[in-house]
Structure formats: structure tokens, C-alpha cells
Amino acid sequence: GLFSFNTPNFILRFALGKTDYQLGVEDYRRFAAEYEYFGRSVWQQTLNLTAEEQRQLITLLEKNYRPENRIYRYNFFYDNCATRPRDKVEESLQKSGSQLLFSNAHTENGETKSYRDIVHQYTKGHPWAQFGIDFCIGSQADHPINDRQMMFAPFYLMDAFAGARIANTSDNKALVASTKKIIDCEPDVSDSAENDIWNM
């Protein structure tokens, strides 16, 4: 995804959910080289989709990349680079006659988090970024959120995908067939949460 950092008041608009975001396509080798250069680990989850489910997902992604669809109003919590892929996977499965079922592992285990808690996890070691985002997101970010809302953060989405299942009238299977780390850089944000919020 692409932002124009030349947009007036970009950081404030970003935090307030008033920034336009553009879907971009990049060669995998360039993507991998950039992440490795900046010391960011990359995880890959292979989805356990049938040929028809794959076709539906590709069709939706191609539709989303059309010029009239590729720009949308980014929202830091509700419509971002983690929630959009989740929604497209759900939509593609529905079109194939299946349903994506997520567990509620965090809330069922009694874990209580707010949006701000997760933002602080990802901005650890970056006090000015943390202060700026805290200033902009307001008190609504302090309310407890459910597992689905936690998926605005990529590692929470990855965990949710790992525990999700695809269900239909004839089958019930895991969404993720395999997970592996394809670029291994230290420290790993999944362990130390040291990457800043912009890398979400």
C-alpha cells in the first residue's frame, strides 16, 4: 500500500483516519530486498484454499486494484493494511459457499486489551511516535476491544489466521496450511515489539 507523505498535515490525518491509501503492486524480489535492508522480518502464511476459493480471491484482488477502486480512505484501526486482506479472504470464501470462523482466544483467556495497549506494544522504544499517536487517537482508544478488532495489528491478524477455520456444508478445515519465516531479521517484532507503528 502507498501513502503520499506530501499530503498536508499527513501525520495528523493518518492518526485521525483521514488519509487516502492506494493499493500498490510490487515485484516480490524488490519487496523482500527492502524489508531485509531495513531489518524487518517477514512471515508467510500459506492459505489452505481450493482452486475455486483461490480463483475467487484473485478475482477480488484484481477488482480491488482497478483504478476506480485502488484508492480508499485509510482508517488506522478499522480499514488498514491488515483488515483489508482479512476482509477480502472472508469475502472470497463467502462467494465460494464457505464461511471463515475465527476463535476468540484472547478474550476467552480473559485477556483485556485496548487499541492503545496494542499501539504501545508496537511503539515501544519510540516515545515521540507513541506520544504523537496517543495525542491523536483520543479516549475511544482506551475501551476494551474484541479479538476481531485486535486484527488491525498484523501480528494479531497472523495469530487469528493461524487459529481460523474454513467451514461449509461438507468440510471444516484450517485456514492456514503452513507458516514460515521467509526473511529472518533480529530483533523480531513478534518477540520484542520494537518496530515502530509505521511498519504495521
Model-found features: residue ranges?
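Glycine-rich catalytic cores of cysteine/serine-nucleophile enzymes that process amide/ester linkages
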Residues: 1-40
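Generic structural motif
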Residues: 2, 19, 52, 138-140
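A structural motif
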Residues: 49-64
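Acidic/histidine-rich, surface-exposed loop or edge segments in extracytoplasmic proteins
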Residues: 34-43, 63-69
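Glycine-rich phosphate-binding "P-loop"
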Residues: 46
